[in-house]
Amino acid sequence: MSLKSTKTTAASETYLDDETTWDSLNLDPRLLQAIDKLGFENPTLIQSSAIPLALEEKRDIIAKASTGSGKTAAYAIPIIQNIMVQGSQLGTQSVVLVPTRELSNQVYQFMEQLIKFSNNKIGILNLSSNYSDQVLKSLLINKPEIIISTPSKLIQTLEAHEGKDIIDLSTVKNLTIDEVDLILSFGYKDDLQKLESYLPVKKNLQTFLMSATVNDDLNELKAKFCTKPAILKLDDDQSNNNKLVQFYAKTTEFDKFLLSYVIFKLNLIKGKTIVFVNNIDRGYRLKLFLEQFGIRCCILNSELPINSRLHIVEEFNKNVYHLLIATDDISVEKEEVDEVDEGEEEHEDAADADEKKQQNNNNNNNNHNNNNKEHKEVLKKNEKNKKHSSKKDKEYGVSRGVDFRNVACVLNFDLPTTSKSYVHRVGRTARAGKSGMALSFVIPEKEVGKHKTASLRSAKKDEKVLNRIVKQQQKNGFEIKPYQFDMKQVEGFRYRADDAFRAVTQTAIREARVKELKNELINSEKLKRFFQENPRDLASLRHDKELHPARVQAHLKRTPQYLLPESARLDVKNLGFIPFHKNKVGKYRKKSKGTKKRDPLKSFKK
């Protein structure tokens, strides 16, 4: 059996503008020095277009470009350049809004590198970090020039300190909203409306709206915050068509685990892989299952502390880990599924309008009442889900906006519930001109529920969601190909997978979650300051240690040769000479009598 894996190669210079140099942009020497330190030889197309418009013409910018095209530097460089030219004044001059805490930290680290040679004259505050109230007050009183935050955290801080001289946005000259489409899909529209009253919108406020897609919701923000913006669209879809290879494989509920075991144990995918699951328990079940075969992996979900999540992303980007199991269980997706289903029903109703007119009014009323009952049931389920997920971080988002570097493959172990979520998951690979592969497991409707322990509720709609994904990808010029595994060669691994899967009980999953949380809380809180002072010791902190299920089976870690496909077995002819009988030289050799130990005091002669 073989799986067509796409190896990541060096970045093709698709996005670079070779005709433009950094010196030609008339930037501050300190900023140029920082850019050179980062290793940026030439600006990208989006940067060479946006930076002159922002600095020379003072235009608002609306930029649409794919991930890895340099959108962050396109707004970060003009912000810092303006502050360096005008000098550090009293008051906050720039606000950067991002959808998730992980992305907030990445933007903060990037901007810190850009101000490396500014002699600490520019202050940057990452409001999404875990600060105590006293520490946060002291940082805000210093009036940092740049504030990076999620919309909800910024509004929460503004309302908590309203009427106090702690945080004041009346001096802001630049507003940046990064990943606009994600911010709107996360439900931050109300927060953006509240933010409008705190900002000097009617004055000279320069705005950057950065997004991978442009939709109708963007027009609302454009009307609120922009005046005669310059709209930049980097049409790079065609150049990326050959970079991303997409497959889907129809399989059973248990065979998902079996195929995952075979793929990772035989190293069929070369390079780093992100595996997406739809809930937290699912992630731990897969981790406990794989680690019985000696397959090391780490978990990323919304229950982990923010410091641990950020460290996992950083270590993954440094190639410390090669297999990451990420939970993508955002409640927005459930709402989108309901909206899509309702939209389809409305479309079907409109198509059959003529037939329905001939029916009795009583039937229409009954249908209306049934729809109301179904709607109430959906609301009840959503309320239960909200209560159940109260401990999760609402600003967690691993499939959206986070910069995972050099990801060779994205494996959708659980198919996402919407086509939009699929696009964001797949967007973690084939970034910045590099190649990548996406493989999605799909459960046919007739196979759902046959294996209760391995079953997942959202799998009922896998085929419907797949059809939407295929249609959307075809519109964008992409193709998702079916992939057929040679199950005859996989069957030999089934009995071992059965043993390992039975060992992963619900009790083992619960104990693993508690153990993981305890370890991560200790690493995140108590040792945070120690690791800051001793960065070398941070390397010893690993997140892919075995969690040890209740039943450890050491023999599963070794794969016998007879289970491997013929192409992967060792060549018997080249094993060398192996004697039939073991070498018996010395077997009958008499044991030499060792000299008795002598006591030097007793043997001492006068």
Curated annotation (Swiss-Prot):
A motif (Q motif) lies at residues 20-48. The keyword Ribosomal protein does not apply. It is an enzyme of class 3 (hydrolase). CDD domains: DEADc_DDX56, SF2_C_DEAD. It comes from the Eukaryota. One of its GO terms (molecular function) is RNA binding. Residues 261-488 form the Helicase C-terminal domain. PROSITE patterns: HELICASE_ATP_BIND_1 (PS51192), HELICASE_CTER (PS51194), Q_MOTIF (PS51195). Pfam families: DEAD (PF00270), Helicase_C (PF00271). Its main location: nucleus. Disulfide bonds: none annotated. Residues 586-596 have a biased composition (Basic residues). ATP-binding RNA helicase involved in the biogenesis of 60S ribosomal subunits and is required for the normal formation of 25S and 5.8S rRNAs. This is ATP-dependent RNA helicase DBP9. It comes from Lodderomyces elongisporus (strain ATCC 11503 / CBS 2605 / JCM 1781 / NBRC 1676 / NRRL YB-4239) (Yeast).
